[in-house]
UniProtKB/Swiss-Prot annotation:
Organism: Histophilus somni (strain 129Pt)
Active site: 134
GO BP field: co-translational protein modification; translation
Entries under HAMAP family matching the protein: Pep_deformylase (MF_00163)
Recorded catalytic activity of this chain's protein: N-terminal N-formyl-L-methionyl-[peptide] + H2O = N-terminal L-methionyl-[peptide] + formate
Protein name, per record: Peptide deformylase
């Protein structure tokens, strides 16, 4: 397995809308494994393929981080959503930054698994929030896009400053 490079906001590639997956081969399986490895290495609970510059509709999730309840959603689609909730969200593409995003409390999702088989998933709480967050990525949206223009600009400035510091220390 290999670690993948996570794109950092405001990288324009994060705005790319992902294409559906149609081939479920060994290359896809390896890529999904690499997504999980990257997600765990970065201490995330979810990762969208768009975040690693692969613009396919693939999401990996492990809310507990135990590797025992891994969820793979390929070509996910929210069919129903109910209730109102929200938390201070973080994102591997916006390291160290958080922002409150209103979300639906419960979602019903249609997706495909690693083998291309269709399934339905009913999710609530943190899992529902994570699914919505990751599907946003597949649609070219980062959580900062849900914030006010002023907060979004401050986030960009902080991340650009951080990137300059990292580049300087190399």
């Amino acid at each position: 397995m290999a670690l993948l490079n996570v794109l950092i906001y405001p990288d324009e590639r994060l705005k790319t809308v992902a294409e559906p997956v149609s081939v479920f081969d060994e290359e896809l399986q390896t890529f999904i494994d690499n997504m999980f490895e990257t997600m765990y290495h970065e201490e995330g609970i979810g990762l969208a393929a768009t975040q690693v510059n692969v613009h396919k509709r693939i999401i990996t999730i492990d809310i507990e981080g135990t590797k025992e309840n891994q969820i793979v959603l390929i070509n996910p689609e929210i069919l129903e959503s109910f209730g109102e909730t929200g938390i201070e969200e973080g994102c591997l593409s916006l390291p160290g930054l958080r922002g409150f995003v209103p979300r639906k409390e419960t979602v019903k999702v249609k997706a495909q698994n690693r083998q291309g088989e269709d399934f339905m998933l009913d999710a609530d709480g943190l899992l529902a929030i994570c699914i919505q967050h990751e599907i946003d990525h597949l649609n070219g949206i980062v959580f900062a896009d849900h914030l006010s223009p002023l907060k979004r600009q401050r986030m960009k400035e902080k991340l650009l400053k951080l990137q300059k510091q990292i580049a300087k220390n190399r």
